[in-house]
Amino acid sequence: MKNCSKYTATQKGRQGVFEAITPEDVATLIYTSGTSGAPKGVMLTHRNLLHQINNMWEIVPAVPGDRFLSMLPPWHAYERSAEYFILTHGTQQIYSSVKYLKADLQKYQPHYVFSVPLVYETLYSSIQRQISSSSPARKTVALALIKISLLYMEAKKIFEGTVLSKNPVKPSSISYMFNCLWARIVAALLWPLHNLANMLVYKKIHSTIGISKAAISGGGSLPMHVDKFFEAIGIKVQNGYGLTETSPAVAARRPFCNVLGTVGHPIKHTEIKIVDIETGEVLPDGSKGIVKIKGPPVMKGYYKNPSATNNALDQEGWFNTGDIGWIAPHHATGPSRKCGGILVLEGRAKDTIVLATGENVEPAELEEIASRSSLIDQIMVIGQDRRRLGAIVVPNNNEALAAAKRKSSLDGNNDEAKDTVMNLLYDELRTWMAGCSFQIGPILVVEEPFTIDNGLMTPTMKIRRDRVAAKYQSEIEALYE
């Protein structure tokens, strides 16, 4: 009886502790990655985390037994949220890393992958290299079929209503009917060739990497050429958006409405608005401004940092993300009828470069375009308070030297080779950025890549601009002399 009384008392004490914990209590502290400043402790509550678990199934309709592969550190907000979702839905989780990703994809054949855009860019590059290394005939056929599949997908989007548009004025009914009819004809004509591509090319890719249901991308913007490629070969990539301060997910593309170039519709019970950068006034759909978030996923505040909390959260509970974006206008009919309310991101407000001329430049847009070059592994655009833009470039040495050797007789490591590579990089930037409003002038070529280990990238593989700029400060100064 004595032991029983002791056990009962202990149980009552535990029950008291359980009852004392409320949904608004802090469940965890997660520190921001500090892309452009010092890390801050984000206080996430039980309500924040439960909102993610309860509302992610609409985006990831997993069933018991599904296999998930992820490779982010478990203390990262994106990975933490994904783990909670996986563990509460009876599914399997496979942990991998960049080093073992290719082998693990083939071995475990996951239904879903949770990762960041850079991983999908790496997969894209790997597939492209495999195609390029095949025989000339196979390479020509594969590239031709991929182009046909891209055209097929573009035609489908017109009559499916998933063509992204910034224009608030809907197209005329007659114009849409004509375009829709033409798109259906084009899709019907291209379907046999697209189906042939599935059998000859895409089936082999699928058997190598799995991802039979969807790849969930978060932590950054997905380059459009990567987005289009995976859709063309039949691998659904659902891009989402969130921050550590928002638990993290606030928007994501749905399986039934996967509009390329966007981060999808808001998660349930989450509000998103776009405000003017200077005045703070709410902007109409289609207008670009600062993205603000309100709702259950928004953090309680920064740990022991009321000043930072007040800067990020206003009195009405709106969180200033610091991101620039716009919301797609609603169209009842037409090729964009399913896009209304979708969020589109266009860079970071605090990453904006202000030139000495007073012009504002979004570096992320230029970096995304420049990184399409096979000669460039990484690039960071610079130019704050300068007369013109510049860039720090980490070249793809194998591709760059191969291109240099094709251009002239080089031994690969002499000064002539370096000069030739430099000239090739300038040519590449001019070619890829020919249609841009801003051009990149001087470039600094560095051999050391930006990585998590050397502190030049965050765990979600975003470049830490402040650290890169500090590391190469003297070289940047010399670049502009």
Q: Which residues does each PLM region occupy?
A:
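Conserved pre-ATP/AMP-binding loop-to-beta segment of ANL
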Residues: T8-Y31, A38, P61-R67
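Conserved AMP-binding A3 loop
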Residues: A27-I53
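Conserved AMP-binding/adenylation subdomain of ANL enzymes
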Residues: L50-R67, P74-F178, W182-K203, K236
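C-terminal boundary motif of the adenylate-forming
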Residues: I324, R372-E399, L429
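Conserved C-terminal "lid"/linker of ANL adenylate-forming enzymes
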Residues: Q378-I382, Y426-E481
